Amino acid sequence: MEALSAALWLSALAVAESGGGGLPLWLLPWAGLPLIALLLPLVLIDLDHLWLPEPLCRWGLVLGLVLSAAAGIPVLADHLIAACLALLLMESISALAERLLGQPALGLGDAKLAAMGGAWRGAAGIAAAMALAIFAGALFGAAARLSGRLQPRQAFPFGPFIALGIWLVWLTGPLWWWQQWLHLLGL
């Protein structure tokens, strides 16, 4: 765990120019440090308790918006709108899934983490991050079901997949991931 943590901290310094969601180039490596400082405990807590603490998500959202303001009003507006839409979309999906399945399918912490990601990544970034999260979560869920480690309708933490998506898109930018999806589909 310590080696993974160290690698994540070091990777914050290797962010590509396209990865910072419109932030000034000089700010990119330093902005990644508080982002990983927020994502790492959120992942560990969700893995242990199936819970994403709202105060961490809230502070992450505020810090993401403050840093976005350093890039100017257009970037701040994009990130603010992305945060609001991510929250509303995830809460809507959660409510719809609960109605259809008769049990909760997503925790509201997942919606708050997605909103935090929108504050850091903007609309294009959180869309790519959530696509990665859904893909990774589906792969994990399928593998766990096939191996018998996950029972039907058994809950598993989705926050780590959202955090993974946010971090990967932070490092490379959303365009690179969309290009990889298109390449994978043969387009």
Question: PLM features: residue spans?
Answer:
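Functional transmembrane core segments of multi-pass inner-membrane proteins
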Residues: 23-24, 28-140, 179-187
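Hydrophobic alpha-helical transmembrane segments and immediately flanking/interface helices
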Residues: 17-32, 146-158
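N-terminal transmembrane signal-anchor/hairpin module of polytopic inner-membrane proteins
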Residues: 1-23, 176-177, 181-187
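Short, structured coil/loop segments at alpha-helix boundaries
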Residues: 21-25, 165-168, 174-175
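Hydrophobic residues in alpha-helical membrane-spanning segments
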Residues: 42, 54, 158-161, 175
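Alpha-helical membrane-inserting segments
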Residues: 8-12, 16, 67, 71, ...
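Core segments of transmembrane alpha-helices
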Residues: 1-9, 57-64, 111-113, 158-163
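Interfacial loop-to-transmembrane junctions
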Residues: 108-112, 142-168
